[in-house]
UniProtKB/Swiss-Prot annotation:
The lineage of its organism: Eukaryota, Metazoa, Chordata, Craniata, Vertebrata. It comes from Rattus norvegicus (Rat). Pfam families: DPCD (PF14913). One of its GO terms (biological process) is ventricular system development. It comes from the Eukaryota. Signal peptide: none annotated. This is Protein DPCD. InterPro entries: DPCD. GO terms for cellular component: extracellular region. The gene is Dpcd. May play a role in the formation or function of ciliated cells. Belongs to the DPCD family.
Amino acid sequence: MAVTSWLEILRSAEKTALLQDGKRMVHYLFPDGKEMAEEYDEKTSELLVRKWRVKNALGALGQWQLEVGEPMPSGAGSLGSELIKESNANPIFMRKDTKTSFQWRIRNLPYPKDVYSVSVAQKERCVIVRTTNKKYYKKFSIPDLDRHQLPLEDSALSFAHANCTLIISYQKPKEVMAAESELQKELKKVKTAHSSDGDCKTQ
C-alpha cells in the first residue's frame, strides 16, 4: 500500500514538463506547498536530478535542496559555491542513480578499499560509512525507502573504490522499481513544452 500512496501523492501534484537539451524536466507542486523538480534523460528515462523546495515559517520559498545529482556549479547558490571552493581536498558527497540501484559517490577519498566499512543502521534507517583509520565518517538516509516505507537491507548494499572515489550502491527493491515504472507512464501523460515554446503549462 505504501507504494500506491506515494504514487497517489505524485499523481495528485500539479505537474509541468519541459523538454530541453535532451532532458525532460518535470516540476511538481504538492497540495502542502512543497515543490519537487526532476530531470530525466529523454532517451533512457534515467533520473539525473531531483531537488526539493519548501516554504519557511513566514511562507517564503527556501533554497532548493539537492537529493539526486551533481552539486551545482559555482555561483548557483551558496551550497554550490561552497562545494566548488572545497573540492580540491575535502570529500564531496553526491548521489547519482542507475536504473537498478541508488548510487552515491564520495570523491577525494584516497584510502584503499579495505579501509572502508559500509553498513546499514536499521534503527536509524540510514547507511553509515566508516574508515578503519578514523579519517572519514558519513551517515545518510535513503529518502526513497522512507517514502515507500520499506526496510533497509544490508544484503542490498555494496561498494567499490576507484580513482579516489568511493562508489556505494544499494539495489532498488522491486516495489521502488515498479513505482518508478508507473511514474514514467504517468509523466508521459503530462503535456510537455519544448524550450522554444516559452513557459510550460501546468497540468
